[in-house]
Regions:
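Compositionally biased terminal segments of proteins
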Residues: 1-300
Length: 300
């Protein structure tokens, strides 16, 4: 599995090539009752779902060996009580168990081997003190939300996760599942909420792939088309419009302000260009064009 300090050449896990088929296996293991109403794919799997085939001249996206699933507060708050067991049973049916670090069980990260690939599923959720749902911290850490009465599973709270449920979209892909080929409808974070999550990740951790994912996605969609997607998000006209504007402004005007900013620098580092000025200028140019397009559409 690639680490936070990994570069493009580190992403050689077999799951990178079969991620979507394995992702479908994971989601299908939860059962038909789940639908796409309470979870969405976030993280590094999103670019490959948003862009099925990159335009000529753009290298294929360097995939991820992790599957990040964002769960709704409705699920965590017990309004969908039967789903806890569905998630646990589904993950275990694929040979996954809660990860262990030392003597501590990481109940929001499940790992194992499925179809001869090492699989890692991370369960994420909104910060629970938002949206009129204040409550005390969970038993382990304020960033962890326990799920269900058994204490067997949890979710890790992430910044701006509360934007995802309103901005979840569905994307169909023909994939190779464990049961055969299938056209599967994947629920995933829309571009607007996903960029907010990525911007928050760039702020809070030193993982070069976050910046790479942003630049690659904007390149592959095209800055103008990407801004159209953001402008059409229900978040733009909703109660979270101010948060969306502020977080996107942070991304384009601070994290990608100039070639020495963290965004271009991490993008170049991920591509193993080190401090390569060409890679940094490319990243800056792509995000700057996206920023201009957002401004033209009145998003920022």
């Amino acid at each position: 599995m690639a680490t936070d300090n990994a570069r493009a050449s580190s992403y050689d896990d077999p799951m990178s090539e079969r991620l979507l088929g394995i992702a479908a296996d994971v989601l299908r293991s939860f059962g038909s009752g789940f639908g796409g109403h309470h979870l969405a794919i976030v993280g590094g799997a999103v670019p490959g779902l948003l862009v099925e085939v990159p335009p000529t001249g753009i290298e294929p996206h360097v995939g991820t060996a992790d599957l990040d699933l964002h769960l709704s507060l409705h699920l965590l708050d017990g309004e969908t009580a039967d789903y806890y067991d569905s998630i646990i049973d589904g993950l275990r049916s694929l040979g996954l168990e809660a990860d262990i670090e030392g003597d501590r069980h990481i109940k929001w990260r499940w790992v194992g081997r499925h179809r001869n690939a090492r699989v890692q599923v991370e369960l994420l959720c909104p910060v629970r003190t938002r949206g009129g749902r204040p409550e005390g911290p969970a038993s382990d850490t304020p960033a962890i939300a326990n799920m269900g009465p058994s204490g067997e599973i949890a979710a890790l709270a992430v910044g701006f996760g509360h934007l995802v449920p309103e901005d979840t979209i569905a994307v169909e892909r023909r994939v190779e599942t464990a049961s055969g080929n299938l056209t599967y409808q994947f629920p995933l974070a829309g571009l607007a909420s996903w960029l907010c999550l990525k911007s928050d990740a760039i702020m809070r951790r030193d993982k070069a792939k976050d910046a790479y994912d942003v630049v690659w996605t904007l390149d592959a969609l095209g800055p103008a088309a990407a801004s159209d997607r953001v402008a059409s998000s229900p978040l733009v006209a909703g109660d979270s419009a101010g948060e969306l504007e502020a977080q996107l402004t942070l991304l384009v005007a601070d994290q990608f302000r100039d070639i020495d900013s963290v965004g271009p620098t991490q993008y170049a580092a991920f591509l193993e260009g080190g401090a390569g000025e060409g890679e940094r200028r490319h990243a800056l140019g792509t995000v700057s064009e996206f920023a201009r397009a957002l401004a033209e559409r009145g998003v920022i």
